Design a protein with these regions (language model features):
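Aromatic- and acidic-residue-enriched segments that line the glycan-binding/catalytic groove
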Residues: 26-38, 72-156, 217, 252-262
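Short, acidic/polar
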Residues: 1-6, 174-193
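A structural signal for isolated positions on well-ordered beta-strands in alpha/beta enzyme cores
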Residues: 16, 66, 236-238
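N-terminal structural segment of carbohydrate-active enzymes
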Residues: 1-64, 72-74, 79-80, 114, ...
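Active-site rim elements
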Residues: 170-176, 199-204
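Aromatic/hydrophobic pocket-lining residues that form the small-molecule binding cavity
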Residues: 47, 51, 176-183, 211-212
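Active-site-proximal helices and loops of the catalytic beta/alpha 8
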Residues: 55, 59-62, 73, 84-86, ...
Length: 264
């Protein structure tokens, strides 16, 4: 908030910020490995200043807030409302996974093995993933909240909708209405707060049909309903598409594919 005047003086009219939903810890500081879509990560707020204050301060200066959101995947520590595997200890060192992420083990009514913390890192990862992707041959993800395909996919065909792009990005089954409705509910809260647009991460890894049916209409309806929170302004959405074919972006016209519009 203190830097908004400086940013505006540079000529910028909007601030695009990385995802703010709660992540795990350690390397998951950047926002792209959600642990709880329904909460703002405490590391971005203080007791006196909340995300709403940033939105209001930007609007007061006639600036916009573009929020980066992730619909395609979670992190690999489960998700608090889809597959709860850990409790979060905010009083511990947030750079230490073992200290701040408290496993909910079987003896405590959870899903992780009782010896979880003594397992090597790779086995810990497998113990988490089996409850999200059924990687050990058991049907643990009975609600089908995640795609169960591993890493066999191609950048430029439909397989990227179902494959997992990395070990720390567990692919959500966005075709499942329970998943898409949950994501719309969570991110819809930010529309209600007055954010001016969404930059949608890994958009190319979700089918266009799912976007057109499960996400875009619901976001647009909320944006229209809460238009006054943006001082009557439009709501802008754009998505990341990472591919090897330039025509994925704009009909094979290379000069239209970069996103540094004002530099051309």
């Amino acid at each position: 908030i203190e830097k908004l005047d400086y940013i505006k003086a540079l000529g910028f009219t909007a601030v695009w910020i990385t995802p703010i939903v709660e992540n795990a810890s350690g390397y998951d500081y950047h926002g792209y490995h959600a642990h709880d879509f329904s909460k703002v990560d405490r590391r971005y707020e203080s007791e006196d200043v909340k995300f709403q204050d940033l939105i209001d301060a930007a609007h007061a200066k006639d600036m916009k807030i573009i929020l980066d959101i992730v619909l395609n995947h979670t992190g690999n520590f489960g998700e608090a409302n889809l597959c709860k595997l850990f409790n979060r200890n905010w009083d511990a060192d947030q750079s230490s996974i073992d200290e701040c992420m408290i496993p909910i083990t079987q003896k405590d009514g959870g899903k992780l093995p009782d010896n979880y913390l003594s397992l090597p890192g790779g086995q810990q990862h497998d113990a988490r993933l089996t409850h999200m992707k059924n990687t050990q041959g058991k049907n643990n993800d009975t609600h089908n909240y995640w795609h169960h395909v591993a890493n066999e996919w191609n950048w430029d065909d439909y397989s990227r909708w179902y494959g997992q792009i990395a070990g720390d990005c567990v692919d959500l089954n966005t075709e499942n209405p329970a998943v898409s409705n949950y994501l719309v509910k969570c991110y819809g809260e930010f529309i209600k707060m007055g954010v001016d647009g969404f930059r949608i991460d890994t958009g190319g890894h979700i089918s266009r049909l799912t976007f057109n049916k499960a996400f875009i209409p619901q976001f647009e309806a909320l944006a229209e309903q809460y238009k006054a929170k943006r001082n009557g302004g439009d709501f802008f959405m754009y998505a990341e598409v990472c591919a090897r074919e330039r025509n994925v972006v704009y009909r094979n016209h290379e000069n239209c594919s970069p996103f540094y519009y004002t530099w051309k």
